[in-house]
Amino acid sequence: AKLARKMLDDAGLTDTGVVLSNDLDEFTIKSILDSGAQVSSWGVGTKMVTAYDQPALGGVYKLAAKRLGDEGEWEPIMKVTGQSSKQTVPGILDIRRYFHDSEKLAGDMVYDINYGISRERIVDPADELRQKDLSNKRYITLLEPLARKGKVVLKDEYRNALIARDYCREQLELLDESQTRIVNPHSYPVGLEYDLFYRRHELASRLLGLS
């Protein structure tokens, strides 16, 4: 690409662009740009439309609470295994998204709506020592109901793919640039509400016969 650009410029064809293609992905493109190549446009196909890096979605629904009848009290339940990373989070869950004063994203908190929030601090579910204080920050609640008693109740504005795309782009713009870089990005803070973390730990210990 660098040689092609030089040859075109030397021939006076400065308005002719350089187009690159052939199995390009974000890592290859970044490497080419870092080398100083002046590329006008990119042809990205195979690795974009085929979900090349992860062709299978490993998502599985896990029950988090149960109750008897419509009026019964919800009972938190969870899946427990020998691997803490595969243990589910019990309860009727929702998510708060917190913002810095700059309006950049500060972090997301998973909490149980039946217990509320005792303190605005999140704990990494995989590492008790990784905690973040989110107190005194503006927040919004993220989750919207999809169905109630077998009927779809999702609001019309959430069914539009273009609106969803635009919302995703807006939220990505609110991330710190250190969290969106391709190589060695910083992780975005997401964790369990303080008391939920310890209720989950206590329930897992009891189910595994450790307490």
Where are these regions (language model features)?
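A small/polar active-site loop signature that marks catalytic segments
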Residues: 2
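Gly/Ser/Thr/Ala-enriched C-terminal appendages of enzymes
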Residues: 6-11, 16, 24-211
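Small/polar loops that bind or transfer phosphate-bearing groups
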Residues: 20
